[in-house]
């Protein structure tokens, strides 16, 4: 028996006999470009490049910056609150809230920045509402996860202590987060 089928741009020829079976897998000629593109994307997502720690920032605020320096860059926040950190961590967490931007600091140093406001750009010029092609052109292919229609591209920094995370819905950036790894 000989069967031929096409799945996702690939032709599969399958020969079945009493001795066993043999399969020949080959791309459909018209789909060669798509297959090559998918292979490049797959290999790139398996090994995302590490970002230099100095590239982790939004709106002129960088990780490790003092709260006072962040306030000088951003101006007076709409809300400024300080709460005790979890007992296992200790210390205090201070959160500065602006229109579509949140800056969190532990013991006076910025450790988390997130935005949904296109006014605030990453250090490399990516902003909310940019298309995913700009993200990939700027940062390459990050580690990907999908949940509820939102694709999360994660780029670790070279010290593996913090990440740049871009949440994409459709083909547009919806949220940008710079901070510790998220679960």
What kind of region is each of these model predictions?
Residues 15-38:
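Signal peptide processing junction and immediate N-terminal pro/mature segment
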Residues 111, 117-120, 132:
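A low-complexity, Ser/Thr/Gly/Pro-enriched, surface-exposed linker/loop concept
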């Amino acid at each position: 028996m000989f069967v031929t089928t096409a799945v996702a741009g690939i032709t599969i020829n399958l020969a079945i006999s009493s001795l066993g079976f043999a399969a020949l897998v080959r791309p459909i000629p018209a789909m060669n470009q798509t297959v090559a593109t998918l292979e490049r994307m797959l290999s790139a997502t398996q090994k995302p490049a590490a970002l230099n720690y100095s590239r982790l920032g939004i709106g002129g605020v960088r990780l490790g910056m003092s709260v006072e320096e962040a306030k000088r860059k951003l101006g007076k926040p709409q809300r400024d609150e300080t709460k005790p950190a979890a007992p296992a961590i200790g210390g205090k967490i201070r959160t500065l809230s602006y229109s579509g931007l949140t800056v969190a600091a532990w013991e006076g140093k910025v450790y988390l920045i997130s935005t949904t406001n296109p006014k605030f750009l990453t250090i490399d010029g990516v902003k909310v509402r940019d298309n995913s092609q700009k993200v990939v052109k700027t940062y390459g292919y990050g580690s990907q996860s999908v949940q509820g229609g939102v694709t999360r591209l994660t780029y670790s920094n070279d010290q593996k202590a913090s990440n740049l995370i871009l949440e994409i819905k459709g083909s547009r950036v919806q949220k940008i987060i710079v901070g510790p790894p998220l679960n």
